[in-house]
């Protein structure tokens, strides 16, 4: 029997409770910062972002709102990154008029947006009260009364169609983290941690209204949005023949919503992908893939040559397959499941921001 004592804290204070030994677990809306990582006590080991100490439990949508006096109801991801990361940071209005951009909202939510977009400049201070600020943007997980919702596009010259890999129609999905104190877990804490990575726990997450890790499958015939994105937004290096081969190879397969993403130019998976590995392991043990063929399909961003990106996407697909084989203690997986590297093909987002590049740098699982 375990008794959970809960306290309502923001992310900063929750992580502080972990570091000071006042809590065993912290539910946060952002990852730990470098300053928080550096504040580990001597009796703690590892790091706050290590897969043993940090998992993405769910996702939630972040929304942007503007003042009613601002006629602009649309913004691309690249415009948003520029507004938050550049000086002076301008919010484009009609007739060529621009106003200084200001980001407001609760600290947790503004920091979650900045981490999501990989913009690490501190938000600009708001002008004194009473000063008109048509360039104000408010970030929130809830509806903001009397303000106007701003639609966010994945960018490039044309709006990108939704892709559905843990990032459906709304692109601003922020992870909800569960962080454990980086020290030896009590048995009950370890059991609870393991349970949260089971399909049953993810079903509960979805029931609560959050975006869960539960796998969803989509056939290639339902991927018209990805194909349109590839045709409209991929560099000329990505030949029509490559797209044809992608469709031929994936015909008859269904794409799972689980994906694995990598740090730029490496085969190192990010923290969210590490949690996906553990979740995938439990799906195997539950017999989810019994009697099915599986293919690990790698993709890249547009950094580097097209040929080099095909190779690195193939290497990443092989790395994920090998890691799964190790987790399952089944070396036959290295030969039993196919791998495919499609390089820059089928992009989920425009490559003109770090966020978009991270979305495209992935390995997907396709089954039939």
Question: Where are the model-predicted features located?
Answer:
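Extracytoplasmic ligand-binding site segments that recognize negatively charged/polar headgroups
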Residues: 54-128, 146
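Ligand-binding pocket segment of bilobal, Venus flytrap-like solute-binding proteins
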Residues: 14-17, 102-164
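Periplasmic-binding protein-like
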Residues: 77-94, 195-220
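Periplasmic OmpA-like peptidoglycan-binding domain that tethers envelope proteins to the cell wall
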Residues: 13, 299-368
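Ligand-binding "clamshell"
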Residues: 37-53, 60, 145-167
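Periplasmic peptidoglycan-binding/tethering modules of Gram-negative envelope proteins
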Residues: 202, 206, 214-293
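N-terminal segment of the mature folded domain
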Residues: 1-84
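A bilobed periplasmic-binding-protein/Venus flytrap-type ligand-binding module shared by bacterial periplasmic
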Residues: 61-70, 168-169, 173-188, 262
């Amino acid at each position: 029997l375990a008794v959970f004592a809960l306290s309502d804290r923001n992310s900063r204070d929750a992580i502080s409770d972990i570091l000071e030994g006042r809590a065993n677990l912290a539910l946060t809306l952002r990852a730990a910062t470098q300053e928080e990582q550096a504040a580990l006590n001597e009796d703690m080991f590892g790091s706050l972002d290590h897969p043993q100490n940090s998992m993405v439990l769910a996702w939630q949508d972040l929304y942007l709102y503007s003042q009613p006096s601002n006629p602009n109801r649309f913004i691309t991801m690249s415009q948003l990154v520029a507004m938050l990361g550049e000086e002076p940071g301008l919010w484009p209005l009609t007739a060529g008029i621009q106003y200084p951009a200001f980001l407001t909202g609760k600290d947790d939510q503004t920091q979650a947006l900045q981490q999501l977009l990989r913009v690490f400049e501190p938000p600009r201070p708001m002008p004194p009260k009473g000063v008109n600020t048509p360039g104000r943007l408010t970030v929130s997980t809830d509806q903001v009364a009397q303000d106007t919702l701003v639609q966010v596009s994945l960018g490039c010259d044309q709006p990108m169609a939704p892709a559905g890999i843990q990032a459906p129609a709304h692109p601003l999905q922020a992870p909800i983290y569960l962080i454990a104190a980086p020290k030896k877990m009590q048995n009950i804490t370890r059991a609870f941690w393991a349970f949260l990575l089971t399909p049953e726990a993810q079903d509960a997450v979805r029931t609560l209204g959050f975006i869960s890790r539960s796998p969803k499958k989509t056939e290639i015939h339902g991927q018209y949005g990805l194909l349109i994105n590839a045709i409209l937004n991929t560099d000329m290096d990505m030949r029509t023949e490559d797209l044809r081969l992608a469709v031929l190879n994936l015909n008859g397969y269904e794409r799972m919503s689980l994906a694995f993403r990598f740090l730029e130019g490496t085969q190192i998976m990010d923290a969210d992908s590490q949690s996906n590995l553990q979740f995938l392991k439990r799906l195997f043990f539950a017999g989810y893939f019994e009697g099915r063929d599986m293919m690990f399909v790698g993709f890249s961003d547009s950094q580097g040559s097209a040929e080099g990106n095909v190779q690195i996407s193939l290497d990443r697909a092989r790395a994920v397959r090998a890691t799964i084989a190790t987790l399952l203690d089944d070396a036959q997986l290295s030969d039993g499941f196919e791998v495919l590297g499609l390089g820059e093909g089928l992009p989920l987002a425009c490559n003109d921001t770090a966020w978009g590049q991270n979305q495209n740098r992935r390995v997907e699982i396709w089954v039939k």
